[in-house]
């Protein structure tokens, strides 16, 4: 039953991905291969490569290839008998041992839940609304590639032709002339390229004294009056609840036109150089509507920011979520590449030996002596900006990441090729490829399973390190390393560095617990006894 369910889910995902691409849908996780194919030039075919395409048309072959692989995998599982997929008794015992190691077992469950949350994508985190009900029609902006302009939902002026600001629509939902319903994700901010407005908290006037947000202490600091669109109108310094210091004022176009100086609540001088009179300018916002503005990085629990914002104005929770998605996608791309290369080279070295083994070892030694950081710096300088991205960084990591496993695979292959079953296969006429794939490779399963968790931890740590140093992903990718760098440069805002630290350490601990438990469960010496 589980086999058929997994097969049907794979087939359904492939069909939904293909249908979504044809209809312009943007489905969580399923549409990601097509998005990558559109962003990376060599993963799609334009009219320059395929002359039969229209001038504005392209074929995202990488996305279609991924959907085809999902479909074939589902069909393969569906037609295979359940008994053929059953684990051998040796590996079934290892799985049972792993379940008995509670630290690793619960870490695996927690990591699976985290991956499931990351797969929900724009359903949980994003600035686009999930559903909008307006004028008797339903819209799903988060699930379509098309940009819906603001005039579709009643926005006017400069916002009419630009993409609708769904956070503004959410605030005005239910009012006459505005959408009846706007359903936003749990975190209504994009991980990157989405600057949140400054969070504000209202201050209270009593008996001519301005009180802090607790309502008991006279306010000390900067207080502001804001336009309805969130732009700053006036900013005044207060001491002991009365104006004392400089005051500044701006028009809606952010032009500074007003300045004044107060001492102990008394106006000393003022200067106004805008339209009309100063009294008309001061009356643009309601008197007594002073509020406390939290500039970026804003602390946690201000506005709608559970963990606050970073210095660029991005919501930290959304940024951490985006960084988690980047790490998972990087691992899903990086691991198959390095294990394919490492297993292939290692098995060939161990099986053939001789000069091939000797030459390959020397090549590995030469490559391993290259300074990785210098290579990254040189490539970052020479590669055009539009070519930089996740694939470039993963290519550099994969160039150095496959070598550490080749010696383990080589040693195991040299041991297995001397077994009687390999000699019997040769006598029966089996070729080299058949022996390597059907007889030797299955016996390397324990090595692969043991190394995978540590490879995941390595790629997460490598991406964070490169981004921390400034040689990693571009700014349109969320990165825990860049957030850590931002927090360490602003230690007066400890919530920034602590968020990045706990996210990075927590994920590495989970993966390490899983890896150690797998190693312990597959270790034959733990269950060997000597007399």
Locate the predicted segments by residue:
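Gly/Trp-centered helix-boundary motif
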Residues: 1-214, 271-339, 459, 476, ...
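Positions in alpha-helical segments
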Residues: 92-96, 221, 245, 304, ...
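A generic, residue-level signal for flexible/boundary positions that often mark functional hotspots
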Residues: 180, 232, 256, 291, ...
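Glycine/tyrosine- and acidic-biased, solvent-exposed loop/turn segments at the edges of beta-strands
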Residues: 199-284
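Alpha-helical transmembrane segments of integral membrane proteins
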Residues: 309-531
């Amino acid at each position: 039953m589980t086999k058929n369910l997994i097969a049907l889910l794979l087939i359904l995902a492939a069909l939904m991905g293909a249908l979504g691409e044809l209809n312009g849908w943007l489905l969580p996780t399923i549409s990601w291969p097509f998005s990558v194919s559109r962003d990376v030039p060599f993963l799609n075919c334009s009219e320059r490569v395929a002359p039969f395409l229209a001038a504005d048309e392209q074929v995202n072959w990488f996305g279609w290839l991924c959907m085809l692989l999902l479909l074939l995998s589902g069909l393969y599982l569906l037609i295979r008998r359940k008994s053929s997929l059953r684990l051998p008794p040796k590996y079934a015992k290892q799985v049972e041992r792993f379940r008995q190691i509670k630290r690793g077992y619960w870490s695996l469950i927690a990591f699976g839940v985290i991956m499931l949350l990351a797969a929900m994508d724009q359903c949980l985190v994003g600035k686009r609304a999930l559903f909008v009900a307006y004028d008797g029609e339903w819209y799903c902006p988060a699930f379509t590639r098309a940009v819906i302009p603001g005039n579709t939902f009643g926005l006017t002026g400069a916002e009419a032709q630009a993409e609708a600001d769904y956070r503004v629509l959410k605030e005005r939902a239910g009012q006459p002339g505005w959408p009846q319903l706007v359903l936003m994700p749990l975190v209504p901010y994009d991980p990157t390229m989405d600057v949140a407005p400054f969070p504000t908290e209202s201050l209270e006037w009593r008996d001519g004294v301005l009180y802090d947000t607790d309502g008991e202490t006279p306010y000390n600091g900067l207080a502001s009056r804001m336009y309805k669109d969130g732009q700053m109108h006036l900013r005044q310094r207060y001491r002991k609840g009365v104006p004392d210091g400089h005051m500044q004022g701006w028009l809606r176009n952010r032009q500074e036109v007003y300045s004044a100086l107060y001492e102990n609540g008394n106006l000393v001088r003022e200067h106004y150089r805008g339209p009309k009179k100063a009294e008309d300018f001061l009356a643009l916002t309601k008197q007594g509507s002073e509020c406390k503005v939290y500039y970026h990085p804003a602390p946690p629990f201000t506005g709608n920011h559970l963990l606050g914002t970073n210095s660029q104005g991005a919501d930290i929770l959304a940024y951490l979520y985006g960084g988690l998605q980047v790490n998972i996608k990087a691992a899903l791309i990086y691991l198959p590449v390095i294990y394919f290369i490492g297993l292939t080279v290692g098995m060939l070295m161990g099986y053939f030996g001789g000069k091939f083994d000797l030459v390959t070892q020397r090549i590995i030694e030469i490559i391993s002596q290259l300074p990785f950081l210098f290579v990254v710096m040189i490539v970052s300088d020479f590669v055009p900006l539009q070519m930089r991205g996740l694939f470039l960084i993963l290519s550099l990591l994969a160039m150095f990441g496959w070598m550490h496993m080749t010696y383990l695979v080589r040693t195991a292959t040299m041991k297995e090729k001397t077994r009687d079953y390999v000699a019997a296969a040769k006598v029966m006429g089996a070729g080299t490829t058949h022996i390597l794939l059907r007889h030797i490779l299955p016996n390397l399963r324990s090595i692969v399973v043991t190394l995978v968790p540590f490879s995941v931890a390595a790629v997460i740590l490598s991406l964070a390190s490169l981004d921390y140093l400034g040689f990693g992903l571009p700014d349109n990718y969320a990165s825990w390393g860049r957030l850590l760098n931002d927090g360490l440069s602003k230690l007066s805002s400890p919530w920034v560095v602590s968020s990045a630290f706990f996210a990075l350490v927590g994920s590495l601990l989970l993966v390490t617990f899983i890896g150690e438990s797998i190693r312990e469960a597959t270790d034959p010496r733990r269950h060997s006894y000597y007399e």
